[in-house]
């Protein structure tokens, strides 16, 4: 049996926290965050409930939660390995303005996205933040 673990590191230059969960077997009861959460499931299958929608998530799935999105998940098969980014509203607002030119809070329309390229980019950013890589590499 694998040992459960959690790692986390805040990156002040990017204004976000990267964290990883390994070998998680416990359910996550319904909860929400005051910040944006973007994550990638690396291992295990879970049943995710977000709002009124229930779906099975597994390796490679990208999870997108807006601040205040109520969500819960329970184990379906195997323990969970997950990597995520916690992004404060202020950081997301600044990023949205930089990309769109508009100072408006963005919102995710779906809680789960199946996009291998996006998952790969998120993994690279996650590794760069946890590994304390040079700022230029993280900003890519």
Regions found by a protein language model. Name each.
Residues 2-105:
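N-terminal regulatory/effector-sensing and dimerization cores
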């Amino acid at each position: 049996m694998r040992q459960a673990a959690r790692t986390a590191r805040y990156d002040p230059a990017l204004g976000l926290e990267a964290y990883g969960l390994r070998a998680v077997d416990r359910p996550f009861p319904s909860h929400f965050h005051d910040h944006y959460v973007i994550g990638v499931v690396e291992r295990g299958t879970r049943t995710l409930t977000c709002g009124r929608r229930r779906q099975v998530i597994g390796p490679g799935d990208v999870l997108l939660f807006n601040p205040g999105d109520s969500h819960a998940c329970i184990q379906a098969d195997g323990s969970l390995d997950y990597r995520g980014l916690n992004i404060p509203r202020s950081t997301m607002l600044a990023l949205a303005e930089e990309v769109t030119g508009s100072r408006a809070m963005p919102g995710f329309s779906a809680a789960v996205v199946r996009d291998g390229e996006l998952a790969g980019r998120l993994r690279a950013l996650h590794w760069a933040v946890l590994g304390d890589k040079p700022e230029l590499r993280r900003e890519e």
